[in-house]
Amino acid sequence: MQRKQRETTEMKKALIALTAFLSIAAHADTPAPSDDSDLPEWAEKQIGPFHATMTDWVDGTSRSIDGFFGTTDALTVDSDSYLRISQELAWKEGEEFDQDLGVRFRLDLPTTEERLRLIIESEPDETRGTLDEQESSLADDRGNSIEDVLVGLRHLGEGDRTREWDTELGAGIKVRLPLDPYARLSTQRLWTLNDGPWKLHSDNRFSWFNEDGFSARTRWDLGRLVDEKRHLRFISNAQWREEVDTLEFRQVAELNQRVNSRSVLRYSAAVLGEGLSHATIEDSYLQLRFRRDIHKGFTFLDVAPALHFPRDVDREPRWALTLRVEMYFRRFIDRVTL
């Protein structure tokens, strides 16, 4: 009885959140008074100085380190350094709400040597777990532990990925005790099929960590613009990790729709599975994701209701809802894209 009451309470919370989402989406194309923020004036006054101070610190720190190891060009060259702070709330039918406070940073030092960069980053792709765990997070990447900080060198590829494979080599250490050395090889390629609207992008990585062993992952992304506001994509992912010794795969079809300059919608249908000779579909789901730039291009809201059909409950439908707020500290960033 108590479990049933708890599930009913959780469902009510999810419905309230979903109602709020539908309300936001319904008014997403209505111009706001300030046109670049949905926050009240008092919140803007609190966030503005804090964001400016943190952004200056991130940018200044990366350029100071880069100038020490590199050249005076560090004061003017573009840098991919950033800090992201996020708060995520996830709910699945039959389970309690799961809260996750995440911090991810990346210090990109572009002038250390020609085509050689010193990279300091938290939570690389190799530490993000299974494809199912990656799917459960709305972020393209997530970082939760200071133990997974990498310090390494990356040799940039010289190729034009539209004409040939662009290859990058990297090596370094994971900052933890005992120190965990790593090496990785990445390749990328972009094709325009028959000079038409379809583009195929391939992104591959082969890695070795002393503690976790070898891993390999590949991503193939076939997409095209449908019109000025819609983009269609078919994405295939596969990964293998020595520590679990199984092949995981995911196939996604998604339609991205730009509502306006600050809002996008994504409609997705996906299947996730594992195994090679005896492959099994572990889950399939339908998801609607709404992403909104709620404040001046550096604070974003994501709301994503989904309907899952997991194998472990005989494909019975299970609702899920994820809410996420994230703030970026970086000079230039555009995270509301198709």
Which ranges hold each PLM region?
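Cleavable N-terminal export/targeting peptides
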Residues: M1-S62, T72-D73, I333-L338
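Residues that cap or initiate secondary-structure elements
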Residues: W91-E93, P124, R161, V175, ...
